[in-house]
Amino acid sequence: MREGLVTRNTKETQINVKISLDGKGDCQANTGIGFFDHMLVLFTKHGLMDAYFDVKGDLHVDSHHTIEDTGIAMGLAIRQALGDKKSIRRYGTAYVPMDEALVLVSLDLSDRPYLVFDAQFSQPMVGQMDTQMVEEFFRAVAFNAGITLHIKVLHGSNCHHIIEAMFKAFGRAIDDATRLDTRIEGVLSTKGTL
């Protein structure tokens, strides 16, 4: 089973993350931020992976360290779970609607970290989650997993719907990119490495 287990302890956060790429969509998420937990569960469910997030952060300050550091640990766990990347499809793209919202996520497990985040939020908060932190979370995941990640909101006005569509689409794109394909010998690159 392709799994990644990361423990990250700083003066601001204590985090344990486990990701199993070949799962069924089971997730336990406890970050202390209800809406963020909900998004992690959706990501896992729609990515058909199993995950565990146990996070204690300095929420008395704000949610920044908790959300960003969870993204760092999650990215490292995904990187670890991918191992040598042999026979993976490498690319994944998903369009996900959520009522009036429509989001595109396209990614490459290239080990060339990059984030293009094309989204605007009309509200500063959804529940206890600062909407500015959505971009910071995805940046942390992309740079620590080695993902070229594009996220584009094609339509939407409700911040909850937009963010939910992002996390679902990211899960589906990761699932697509991490699938094993027996036709691929080694890694999917003319360079012979990713």
Swiss-Prot record:
Gene3D superfamilies: Imidazole glycerol phosphate dehydratase, domain 1. Its main location: cytoplasm. Pathway: Amino-acid biosynthesis; L-histidine biosynthesis; L-histidine from 5-phospho-alpha-D-ribose 1-diphosphate: step 6/9. One of its GO terms (cellular component) is cytoplasm. It is an enzyme of class 4 (lyase). It is found in: Cytoplasm. GO terms for biological process: L-histidine biosynthetic process. InterPro entries: IGPD_sf, ImidazoleglycerolP_deHydtase, ImidazoleglycerP_deHydtase_CS, Ribosomal_Su5_D2-typ_SF. The keyword Amino-acid biosynthesis applies. One of its GO terms (molecular function) is imidazoleglycerol-phosphate dehydratase activity. It catalyses: D-erythro-1-(imidazol-4-yl)glycerol 3-phosphate = 3-(imidazol-4-yl)-2-oxopropyl phosphate + H2O. Belongs to the imidazoleglycerol-phosphate dehydratase family. PANTHER family: IMIDAZOLEGLYCEROL-PHOSPHATE DEHYDRATASE (PTHR23133:SF2), IMIDAZOLEGLYCEROL-PHOSPHATE DEHYDRATASE HIS7 (PTHR23133). This is Imidazoleglycerol-phosphate dehydratase.
